[in-house]
């Protein structure tokens, strides 16, 4: 679906106080031009951008989320927070894709306080990209309410996601290439699915049940899952006491 010609995106920007925010300030002082789509939230470090911030911004129908931090190696904090932001961005994009949100709506960039023109270039490029994608949900071909439900399910699991990141997603090489290699390697996919995506799927199933759906078939159709996948997750949820299954009616209800 083509974006309306008068569409003006809303981009939530989380900017590092020491570098990217300074670059944005220099951009304004120098009168470099970029689209007025950005809504700035200044943070002390890009590593402070929690997964919850990203999911909540999209749940509130932001069309794009931008994270701007110091160049790697220039972070003012130890251990370097921008590596935390880099790891979070890899995880967030995979989760967004699983929910159905186009991961290109999230962008992470390094901009120093002296790079006003670079800030303008990045925002012009990202602004054009978001404008081409259209309003949140349009390029995805999904109902906004369904995307919001997925984001809410992900948001509820953020504490668990952070624990997994800390304990299981330890990147051996603290370089940008090291992070790309770790999150892009072939054996990372089954690890991510088992630890993150399966948990997210169960959270989304629980959310669907709360809306009044009461059978595996209805849940599978609503979420676009395979019926067998839903049945397997429901079996695990039942073992954990999270749902009750009425075998005679093949109906499922959230446990009290």
Can you say where each PLM-predicted feature lies in the sequence?
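Iron-sulfur-associated redox domains of electron-transfer enzymes in respiratory
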Residues: 1-222, 226-235, 256
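A short, conserved structural fragment
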Residues: 238-249
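Minor-groove-contacting beta-hairpin "wing" of winged helix-turn-helix DNA-binding domains
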Residues: 249-255
């Amino acid at each position: 679906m083509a974006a309306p010609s008068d569409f003006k995106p809303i981009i939530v920007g989380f900017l590092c106080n020491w570098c990217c925010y300074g670059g944005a300030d220099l951009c304004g002082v120098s009168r470099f031009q970029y689209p007025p789509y950005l809504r700035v939230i200044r943070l002390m470090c890009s590593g402070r951008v929690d997964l919850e911030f990203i999911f909540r911004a999209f749940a509130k129908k932001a069309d794009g989320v931008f994270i701007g931090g110091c160049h790697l190696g220039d972070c003012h904090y130890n251990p370097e927070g921008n590596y935390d932001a880099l790891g979070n961005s890899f995880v967030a994009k995979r989760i967004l894709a699983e929910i159905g949100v186009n991961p290109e709506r999230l962008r992470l960039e390094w901009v120093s306080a002296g790079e006003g023109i670079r800030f303008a270039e990045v925002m012009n490029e990202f602004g054009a990209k978001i404008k081409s994608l259209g309003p949140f949900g349009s390029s995805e071909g999904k109902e906004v309410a369904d995307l919001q439900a997925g984001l809410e399910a992900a948001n509820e699991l953020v504490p668990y996601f952070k624990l997994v990141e800390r304990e299981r997603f330890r990147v051996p090489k603290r370089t940008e290439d090291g992070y790309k290699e770790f999150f892009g390697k072939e054996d990372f996919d089954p690890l991510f699915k088992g630890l993150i995506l399966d948990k997210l799927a169960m959270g989304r199933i629980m959310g669907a049940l709360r809306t009044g759906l009461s059978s595996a078939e209805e849940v599978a159709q609503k979420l676009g899952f395979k019926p067998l996948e839903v049945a397997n997750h429901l079996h695990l949820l039942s073992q954990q006491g999270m749902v009750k299954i009425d075998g005679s009616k093949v109906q499922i209800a959230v446990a009290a």
